[in-house]
């Protein structure tokens, strides 16, 4: 018996569940992935969608607890971030050469997607949850300076509100602008023209007039429009192919959701899925569940 104990060891890597929020980009966790033929079938379907060989842009990944769904998605995001460790690629190549060929194709074409990880937040609507996840993804990847059209329109809306309802705040804002050698009319004109410098100035002054709060236009906007605009900026200005959204623990969200607001949240999810399906490989949306959606009804 002692001899067997010296020969057989438990791989501790199997004992720790993958947390996408914490483990994304962690090469150590990614390198511990062990490809199987069944998991490669799933990975291959995702990669074929990315390369345009399949049209599955909005999907639900279903499997029981401990099946390796999150670890598989961790590897997928690594591929779509052009950051897959070579050791994992070699393991994929041995297990499934066809999937490895798709990985190689994505590497050659430099198909890079911004990963957006969605988690349910009690008390928040699905609109807010999706926007929060997008803002967090942009910040984490050094893309906070991306300015969608909603940022300019929201700044103009706030200025109009200050002018009509908070004259003292508006007057102080005008004074600050004078210190920066400009005036409110010029600022408004430049905001309408989508000048980034004017938006940066507004963002700089905003905390001085709102007790230190941060200007967060994404959190005040409409989900579909915001994602459309961010995708446009990512593809035209930042070298990305688009966005890949993963709603991990979607099961817990469904099980814990109160009846109030449920229909509206489901409509938001449906709209996002429809946007993904019509996005021409620029948006993918995957929800992770432990059983069929019909079983939750």
What are these regions (language model features)?
Residues 175-227:
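Long, low-complexity, polar/charged, intrinsically disordered or flexibly structured peripheral segments
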Residues 227-237, 264-284:
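Substrate-engagement module of ASCE P-loop NTPases
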Residues 30, 59-64, 71-189:
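P-loop NTPase motor core
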Residues 235-265:
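Conserved P-loop NTPase "ATPase switch" module shared by AAA+ and STAND
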Residues 293-297:
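Short regulatory helix/loop adjacent to the ATP-binding pocket of P-loop NTPases
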Residues 244-248, 281-290:
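Structural recognition of the conserved hydrophobic beta-strand(s) that form the central parallel beta-sheet
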Residues 99-107, 226-239:
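Conserved alpha-helical scaffold flanking the Walker A/P-loop in AAA+ ATPase domains
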Residues 1-67, 74, 79-82, 93-98, ...:
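Walker A/P-loop-proximal flanking segment of P-loop NTPase domains
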């Amino acid at each position: 018996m002692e001899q067997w104990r010296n020969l057989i060891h438990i791989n501790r890597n199997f004992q720790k569940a993958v947390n996408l929020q914490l483990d994304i980009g962690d090469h150590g966790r990614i390198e511990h992935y062990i490809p199987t033929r069944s998991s490669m079938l799933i990975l291959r379907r995702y990669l074929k969608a990315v390369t345009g060989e399949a049209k599955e842009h909005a999907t639900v990944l279903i499997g029981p607890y401990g099946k390796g769904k999150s670890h598989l998605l961790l590897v997928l995001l690594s591929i779509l971030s052009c950051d897959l460790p070579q050791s994992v690629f070699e393991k994929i190549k041995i297990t499934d050469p066809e999937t490895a060929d798709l990985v190689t194709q994505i590497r050659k074409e430099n198909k890079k997607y911004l990963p957006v990880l969605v988690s349910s937040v009690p008390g928040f609507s699905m609109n807010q949850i999706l926007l929060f996840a997008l803002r967090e993804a942009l910040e984490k990847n050094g893309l906070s300076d991306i300015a969608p059209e909603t940022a300019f329109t929201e700044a103009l809306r706030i200025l109009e509100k200050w002018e009509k309802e908070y004259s003292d705040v508006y007057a102080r804002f005008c004074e600050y602008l004078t210190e920066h050698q400009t005036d409110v009319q010029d600022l408004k004109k430049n905001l309408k023209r989508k000048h980034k410098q004017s938006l940066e100035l507004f963002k700089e002054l905003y905390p001085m007039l709102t007790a230190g709060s941060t200007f967060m236009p994404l959190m005040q906007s409409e989900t579909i429009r915001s994602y459309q605009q961010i995708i446009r900026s990512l593809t035209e200005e930042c070298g990305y192919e688009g966005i890949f959204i993963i709603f991990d623990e979607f099961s817990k969200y469904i099980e814990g959701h109160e009846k109030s607001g449920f229909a509206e949240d489901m409509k938001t999810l449906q709209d996002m899925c429809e946007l993904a399906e019509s996005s021409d490989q620029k948006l993918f949306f995957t929800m992770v569940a432990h059983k069929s959606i019909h079983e939750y009804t």
